[in-house]
Design a protein with these regions (language model features):
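Conserved beta-strand edge residues that scaffold enzyme active sites
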Residues: 11-12, 98, 116, 178
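Hydrophobic alpha-helix-in-membranes signature
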Residues: 9, 35, 42, 62, ...
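Residue-level detector of functional hotspots within protein domains
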Residues: 23, 54, 77, 165-168
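C-terminal alpha-helical cap/extension of soluble enzyme domains
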Residues: 111-114, 118-205
Length: 205
């Protein structure tokens, strides 16, 4: 029942552009011709960067590639993806601090871990942008960054799962190894962050 697929580059071993093109080509050829594809570029984890030239080459070859999710704090790269003579990709940002800048540059949205917990702010920013309230959107963006900064130093996936449990989205915050369980002081910090967020947003649970 999936509406589309996100395809990530292979990890660990570095590949040149030709090898990456062949990889994506082989995966996409195994899909129905009209099945929407997003390239998921997270070079900090895969070590294999999908550069703008490669994205355009892939989009020229495969009409069902509709966009890219880019997870790196590089606004110039966002602009490079969108400045093209060919088909313009739907660009989703995976870096919370660039959400508003991505929209202002021509991106269409975000796919974000913290957004699954603090969704009121992310949806408000998007609505403010759509309504032309750029000053309001900038203030909301600042709030998003402030919360993200408070999470620095706590292991990311365990922190998100703990917050999702606090939010009532999941029943357990257990993570598989090698991710470690959070310490009690780390959980306490997350509880304080979530409580402060609920107070600011007027959330009563």
């Amino acid at each position: 029942g999936a509406d589309g697929i996100g395809i990530m580059s292979p990890a660990f071993f570095q590949m040149d552009e030709e090898a990456l093109f062949q990889y994506y080509r082989d995966v996409i050829k195994g899909l129905p011709e009209n099945f929407p594809v997003y390239i998921y570029n997270i070079p900090g984890c895969t070590t294999n960067d999908v550069k703008p030239g490669l994205l355009q080459k892939l989009m020229e070859e495969f009409p069902n590639i509709v966009g890219i999710k880019y997870s790196s704090p590089d606004l110039m790269r966002v602009e490079d993806y969108l400045e093209t003579d060919g088909r313009k990709p739907e660009l989703l940002i995976g870096c919370d601090s660039l959400f508003l800048q991505c929209l202002m540059t021509g991106g269409v949205g975000t796919v974000t871990g913290p957004g699954s917990i603090f969704h009121e702010r992310f949806t408000r920013l998007y609505r403010q942008y759509q309504e032309g309230d750029y000053a309001g959107a900038a203030m909301t963006q600042k709030k998003i960054v402030e919360t993200d900064r408070k999470l620095v130093g706590i292991p990311g996936i365990p922190a998100l799962k703990t917050l999702l449990k606090l939010r009532g989205v999941i029943r357990t915050d257990v993570c598989r190894g090698p991710l470690r369980p959070l310490k009690e002081d780390e959980k306490r910090i997350l509880e304080e962050i979530y409580a402060a967020y609920c107070e600011e947003e007027g959330i009563h649970e």
